Amino acid sequence: MSAPKKTYSSTTSAKSKHSVRVAQTTADAALEAVYEMSGDSGDSFDYSKSVGQSAESVPAGAVTAYLQRMQRGGLIQTFGCMVAVEEPNFCVIAYSENASEFLDLMPQAVPSMGEMDVLGIGTDIRTLFTPSSGAALEKAAATQDISLLNPITVHCRRSGKPLYAIAHRIDIGIVIDFEAVKMNDVSVSAAGALQSHKLAAKAITRLQALPGGDIGLLCDTVVEEVRELTGYDRVMAYKFHEDEHGEVVAEIRRMDLEPYLGLHYPATDIPQASRFLFMKNRVRVIADCCASPVKLIQDPDIKQPVSLAGSTLRAPHGCHAQYMGNMGSIASLVMAVIINDNEEDSRGAIQRGRKLWGLVVCHHTSPRTVPFPLRSACEFLMQVFGMQLNMEVELAAQLREKHILRTQTLLCDMLLRDAPIGIVSQTPNIMDLVKCDGAALYYGKRFWLLGTTPTENQIKDIAEWLLEYHKDSTGLSTDSLADANYPGAHLLGDAVCGMAAAKITAKDFLFWFRSHTAKEVKWGGAKHDPAEKDDGRKMHPRSSFKAFLEVVKRRSLPWEDVEMDAIHSLQLILRGSFQDIDDSDTKTMIHARLNDLKLHGMDELSVVANEMVRLIETATAPILAVDSTGMINGWNAKIAHVTGLPVSEAMGRSLVKDLVLDESVVVVERLLYLASQGEEEQNVEIKLKTFGTQTEKEAVILIVNACSSRDVSDSVVGVCFVGQDVTGQKMFMDKFTRIQGDYKTIVKNPHPLIPPIFGGDEYGYCFEWNPAMEALTGWKHDEVVGKLLVGEIFGMEMMCCRLKSQDSMTKFMISLNNAMDGTNTDKFSFSFCNREGKFVEALLSTNKRTNADGVITGVFCFLQIASSELQQALTVQRATEKVAIAKLKELAYIRQEIKNPLCGITFTRQLLEDTDLSDDQKQFLDTSAVCEQQLQKVLNDMDLESIEDGYLELDTAEFEMGTVMDAVISQGMTTSREKGLQIIRETPREISTMRLFGDQIRLQQVLSDFLINAIRFTPSSEGWVKIKVVPTRKRLGGNVHVMHLEFRVSHPGGGLPDELVLEMYDRAKGMTQEGLGLNMCRKLVRLMNGDVQYVRENAQCYFVVYVELPMAQRDDAASQM
């Protein structure tokens, strides 16, 4: 046997991928050189043969020259003209030969010298257009990313001819491509991407409405939508595989055209240089491949040809134009599809980047162009497609890993009964672990073969070859045994090309085998008739397919990372477990150990299941579940509280027929159907009916996530809904909308009740940036207004507020477009970097902006965030998390035991309410009722982190301040009487009837806690504790008023211990129970836009609580915005 030269593994590490791309670039350069030589010599260019020979070495200089020609060819297409200018003076440094004619500078008759416009090196391009057009070019050049304003509509100075100016920056200035505006073009009234993106709104809506889990359907849909948008004869989705070759995975075409669906193409068909250009300029249009290109004239002082990498007019290479002509395609439009790419670097760390997944390719049998705004809309559609595709790719990977894990579990279970023979002799077996054509176990000099494999002697020979030439390795994976230099590869034929081998003992192996790639190819078009004599030497899709088959005839599909991980995991389980086939003691020990692990795992599963049930029952989020027939079989305490329907009455009722409002029936039925198919919807709004004490509310509004419930056989047996109660917020927003006054006065008000708000006009320019946004971002109103929301303010690079990822920007753009189309987006995750470089985590809601006639004129954006102080305190609070968890079980028991007698108290009170009572007795019962509600709310506070982090959803409802004061004082009466103290109540008369909007129960909770702490630390001899309320009415603007309330709880004596006060302010090292209560109350007050102070004076101490709440009554009728 000869020593191996090199092993080609199917690994997809970053280093390996880079090596493959470098090698492919060399092959591209070699193929191009052969093509150029054939043209010079007059010989014919044999494409199929040249592809096979392109792997030969090429000088580095030749590769560099090839890459330069691809980007700096000096030729453009005829459907426009190009001018390159210097910054900032706009002096011309290069232009196309057709520019003077295209810009209407060629005289129709002999003009006077004063009327002549001349285009030449050094000309100020602005002088060739109208003054407003020149100003538009200047404005675009002043932006950081000039391409965001494309297309810029300009008019020639002499003729008034309208043109699209499409600009981008290069190393020496600005390149401007000019295209004609045709009368039948879709109207775009202003510069900028947002206007163009509206053209793709319907297509984007359809893509987003597709069910998940079907990449084929997603690809089919996108080609249909692109064809409807552009009108090309053929539209294809073209996917790049791991080995860089391509495949048509979706196609829609004119019926008389030959189908290409299913065809595979060699990697050289789309050169690496072209792929690089697609990453930079994501839309490529060729109007007429038969047209003669136009040359560029440039300043002789420029050292190298002007870069056309980003130009929309860059002429096609002669090789590509010939390919198009041979296939009968005269015009094309190609769009890049880019997704996330997670690669491991040399240290094993994950590097998150972007990669070219493939292309969407449009062909037309006659010359054709689509206007730039429509091309821009298609580019945005590709961003959305890429984002959807990325989710599908990740989901498919997760499902594949899940399948592998399930198979591994079954194989491990087989080891308990018959190791290691069970993994090849039973079902499932090792062939089910990864995709393969055959597998084998070589163990103790015996063979177990499955599927298509080499013979026993050949497997023995492979094992000996591995032991001799790869003795230091635990295995080998390759897509070509021939390229891995296995001497007997030629004897295996096409049936066995690829192999993955795993060493399980010093001399024993597991093998997986794959046949050649051509076997896997699914030919979707008409199969080639051997009687038809195609000229394989011509460049054509069929000859490309022939070349592809030639390239891969000795190769299998590559082994994916996830497959190799699965093989390696099984190898680790087996290696060392069976050193000798007769070592029965070892086998017995392993069996016992695996059985113990299995039993231990079952115990842990039981514990986890019980804990999950407890968490669901006690969760502060409303949770309900139904069985496969739609009947309620889960109804936790929170949803029982918000709906007023007890658990006992909810169980067994129909969700759709009995509990859902009519307007939500269709939505819920769709959720149930999709979940029964395993498709889990998220963030869906549903409305439930109310019962009992909650009937005063029209409905309970929940934002729910649906989760499919499965049995041990993975069958869907029900659906669980985890919700967020947004009823109070919706009611408050509705009422606040009705009572809001002058818009400017409210939005511009620095009051803490006003959230961060920004807005964009119909062209995407920022017109609003309120004080709260200034404080949040660090960017002032005057610094951002007039800039583009996407690209200049929010973007990926040197923008005011840098976003986390490209997907984040795409989602932001989708939400803006949806709002402009009349569809609001509610609370999606939105993270950006502020001026100080700190990331802000927020929830973004977008709403349409309309004028008096109801016409949409822009978009309003609202952010919800936690306060900066709470964010800073987050780290400190999380340090106590472990201690809190330890106490959680104890608290859960106490909470549960309190609920039963509380239900008895509530029942007794309800009985008394039905009797004849005096006014005083009715007031006593009202006070008792709100105290019960406060106790119930405290019992449901299982997740203190939501309070600590500032994300707790406060209830918002109308309430009477007098009821709050009665409840607060009643809670302090027992303790005060025991200590012989008198509670003095000092409140203005209007407090008893004052009606406000807010969370009544939380307000009385914090006030009662401060009052009881004051009583607790007042000496009995002093004799009193006083609570005083000072209301101050404030006008926000227009007719909107808030009530500023100052509560002062004062008491004589030395006051609270210093340590307890420090705990309230998060400044203590530890936390007592009393301190935790005060700390939570202070955070609740801050959630109400207030604060708490504890003041010590000579004779007394006091809590001062400041709160501001909207008033529920106004002096006059509300005016509309």
UniProtKB/Swiss-Prot annotation:
Signal peptide: none
Database matches in PANTHER family: OS08G0260000 PROTEIN, PHYTOCHROME 1
Name of the coding gene: PHY2
Family: Belongs to the phytochrome family.
Domain PAS: 608-679, 742-813
Record domain Histidine kinase: where: 893-1113
Organism: Ceratodon purpureus (Fire moss)
Domain of life the protein comes from: Eukaryota
InterPro entries listed in its UniProt record: GAF, GAF-like_dom_sf, HATPase_C_sf, His_kinase_dom, HisK_dim/P_dom, PAS, PAS-like_dom_sf, PAS_2
Domain GAF: 214-393
Protein name, per record: Phytochrome 2
Self-association state and partner proteins as the record states: Homodimer.
